[in-house]
Amino acid sequence: MLRIQRVLLLCLTAAITGCTGLGRMQAPAISAEEYARHIATLSADEFEGRKPGTAGERKTVEYLVAEFKKLGLEPGNGDSFLQQVPIVEITAGSDARLQLGSAELKYMQDMVIWTKRLVPEISVADSPLVFVGHGVVAPELGWNDYAGVDMRGKTAVILINDPGFATDDPKLFRGRAMTYYGRWTYKFEEAARQGAAGAIIIHDEVPAAYPWDTVQNSWMGPQLDMVAADGNAGRPAIEGWITLPIAEQLLKASGHGYRELLLAASKPGFRAIDLKQKASGALRNAIRRSSSPNVMAMLPGSKYPNEYVVYMAHWDHLGRTLARSGDNIFNGAVDNATGTSGLLTIAQGFVAAKEKPERSVVFLALTCEECGLL
């Protein structure tokens, strides 16, 4: 831990002294003790995992505002340190249902599903299942997993991560380093652009880099989204994840093996495969509109106050899980109390420096990253 702190402190110092117009600054007053104090505070149980819309949000926001004020920084949003982000909270009922082929899946045990459409009820019936590999359309890389397929009314079955991860080929995408094309957020966005009725990602713990219980916790209970004018009507009716064992059963029933299709989908020229099976599902939603704040503070520039350098980190984490008794708080020390604490520590360095920055510096702690909104 000490080694990590030293590296982070070096990065924080470099961030300040290397900024435009700041080359003459002396080393800032940054300490490992202060940085560690912020991390310990923000990841403490009393902050309840810092989930937006909970008591943990209020405590986190109050702490950040108090720390920025203590440093003597100005509000970053007019006369306020807060920038309210309109969001909508959608909670799927526990009776959510999904059938793939002949298999009726168990909610949370075998699958999680939801919808981003702002409707009280939604369903998909007899939607043809299409295996679309990694679900990537990347013209700059000559890659199109949806080539030649009309996805309207169909449900996409999608691999997580990039083709380069499965092949360990550094020349394919970025090898084992995930690009945005490998993220679950992109997979659902692309399925929507393709007009899919449903989009289901296969959870494989190795390329996903997190276990199934992370998926369970992330999509159990209220889901947050931005307020869209069309009520997210362009999103698939049903989005979700299935476990790897369920995916293996589904593919086997279609005459394929998971490993076989994984390797095929990781090679240039892959074409989507009709699985000759259908999906049906339904869920009910409770919908509530609310807001969650970004926290903004500013140090005015001495020469160019209307030009800005922005430092950002998201303050939110996953909150609590309903799937576990006892210690059920996801404290989020690494994700992202470290980043938020770094933001406070960088601010402290700027304030303590003898020579003030020529350009205004904005410190922006963002909400709802864990919900896929950032």
Where is each model-derived feature located?
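Bacterial N-terminal signal peptides that target proteins for export
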Residues: 1-8
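Bacterial N-terminal signal peptides
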Residues: 9-18
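N-terminal hydrophobic or amphipathic helices/low-complexity stretches enriched
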Residues: 19-76, 246, 253, 300
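Extracellular/luminal Protease-associated
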Residues: 23, 31, 108-230, 235-238, ...
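Structural recognition of the beta-strand scaffold that forms the well-ordered cores
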Residues: 40-43, 129-132, 155-159, 198-202, ...
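Noncatalytic luminal/extracellular "stalk/propeptide" segments of secretory-pathway proteins
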Residues: 48-170, 273-276, 282-283, 287, ...
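Soluble metallo-hydrolase cores and metallopeptidase-like ectodomains found primarily
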Residues: 101, 107-148, 230-332, 348-355
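Acidic/histidine-rich catalytic neighborhood of metal-dependent amide-processing enzymes
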Residues: 176, 180-182, 207, 319, ...
